[in-house]
Amino acid sequence: MCGESVSKTECLKIMFKKILIANRGEIAVRVIRACHEFGISTVAVYSEVDRASLHVRKADEAYSIGPAPASESYLRGDKILEVARRTGAQAIHPGYGFLSENANFAQACADAGIKFIGPTPKSMEMMGSKTRARHHMEKAGIPFVPGTARGLTSTEEAEEVAERVGYPVMLKAAAGGGGKGMRLVHARNELRSALESAQSEAQRSFGDSEVYIEKAILNPRHIEMQILADEHGNTVWLGERECSIQRRHQKVLEEAPSPIVDPEMRRRMGEVAVKVAQAANYTNAGTIEFLVDQEKNFYFLEMNTRLQVEHPVTELTTGLDLVHLQIRIASGEKLPFAQSDVSIRGHAIECRIYAEDPDNNYFPSPGKIDVLLQPSGPGIRRDSGMYEGWTVPMDYDPLLAKLIGYGTDREQAIMRLQRALDEYFVAGIKTNISLFRRILRDSDFRAGKLDTGFLDRMLTKPEADPATSPPEPRIAAIAAAMFAVLDPSNSVTKNGNAPPQLASQPAASNWKQKGRAEALR
C-alpha cells in the first residue's frame, strides 16, 4: 500500500492520524472512505441543511459550521480551521469546489500548522488566474490558444486583439470556471456588449471582473491530462480524459482514454502537462486542460489545482487510488512508482447524476428522495452522496452521485453503463438519468465523434423510438410496489398487523405480508 521503499507500518507512522474534510456530498464521502482505509480518523463539517447528509453519517466526528448559504458555512475558512484546531486534525482535504483552489485558505492552513492536502499557496496563486497562468506558460514555451496573456484594459484593446487573431473570439473570466464570464463573439459589432456582460458576470461570480480574449477554436474537443507530483521533485502523468460532452460549458460525461488520442499523442500531451506542473513548482494531484482542434493540435487551456470530479475514470484505467496518493504525498512520501510504471488498461465512462429536471431545461430539482434503487454488478462503480429518505437541499450544486462503467474496451464500458442506467431509479425528485441513456444510444457518441457542441446538437434531434427505450414504467411500478409494502401507513405495521381490507378483497395473511415486507428490506 505504501510503496516498495516504505513499509505499511512505517508509512502509517508518518501519516496523519486525523483529517478534516472541508466539503460535502459524494466527494466528502469518497475522501472519508480513503482515510478510513488508512486507519485515519475523519472530521466532517456541515451546514444546517446538511445535518442529515451522508458525509456526516460516515465521518467519525461532525461539526456544524453555519447556515445553509455556502458563504456562511463551507466558504468560511476561519470556521473550518477552528474546527480543525479544536479536534486536533493535522490535515485538511478540500475536495473540489468551495475552498479547494483558494490560495488564501491554503496559506491560512500553513500558518496554523495544518497541512493542506493539495499544492502550495504559491503554485495555486500562479495557476488560479488564467491570465497569470497563460503568462507563465508563454514564458515556459507551452502552446496555448492565440490571444492575450493578460486581462483586457479596454474595449479598444479587445477590438485590436480580435482583429489580429481573427473572429470568432472567446472572452473568458481570468478567475473563471464552469462557463461563468464566457462569451463567444462572432463579429466586431458584438464585442463591446459581450465584454461588458462578461466582466459583469465575472465580478458577480468570482469577485474579479478581469477578462481576457483568445481565438475561438471551432468544434474543439476538451481533453485533460491528470498529473501527480510529490514534494521531492517527481512528477508523472496518468493519461487523458475526454471531457467534451458539456452543457453550458460544464462537463456532464467524461471518459478515459479519449477515443482520438493514440499512444504518441498521449505521450506528447503528458510531457507538456508535466512541463506545466514543473513550471509552477506544483505538488499533489492536478489536471492540465487542453483544447484540441480538428487536426489534433492541442493548446493549453488552464490548470485545475485540485482533485477533479471525474478522477474515478483515471483510477479505473490506471489501477491507482488518487485520494490515497494525495494523502501519501501530503504526508511527505515519494511517489511509489515512476512514469515507466504507468499503463492505461481498459476504458471507463462517468455520468454525473444531477438532481435536475430534463423536462424543464435541467432546472435544479431539490426535495426528498422517496425511493432509491442504485445499480451494481461487474464493471460498475458508484460514488454517491445520497440515500433513500434524504432531502436534497436547494443551496448547492445539484450533483448527487457519479456512475462509472468500466470495461476491457469502450464498447464493453458502454454496454455495462447502459445496463446500470436501466437499473437506476430515483423517485421523489427529478434526475438527468434519462439524458445519459440517450447519449449512450447516440450514433455519434458510439462512433466517438465528439466535440464541445455535441450535446447541443444531440438535444435538437428527435427522441429515439419509445419502443427502444428502457422499460422505465416497469421499473417505476416495481419501485412503487416496494415503497407501498415498506411504508407502514400503506401496508404491514410494525407489529405485523395488516391494514383494513376492502370488502371485495380476500383477507390477507398477516404472517405472509410481514414476510414479504421483511424480504424486501
Model feature map: region roles:
Residues 5-7:
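Serine residues within intrinsically disordered or low-complexity segments
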Residues 273, 312-314, 318-521:
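Catalytic cores of soluble metabolic enzymes centered on carboxylation/carboxyl-transfer
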Residues 12-288, 292-308:
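N-terminal beta-alpha lobe that positions the nucleotide/phosphoryl donor
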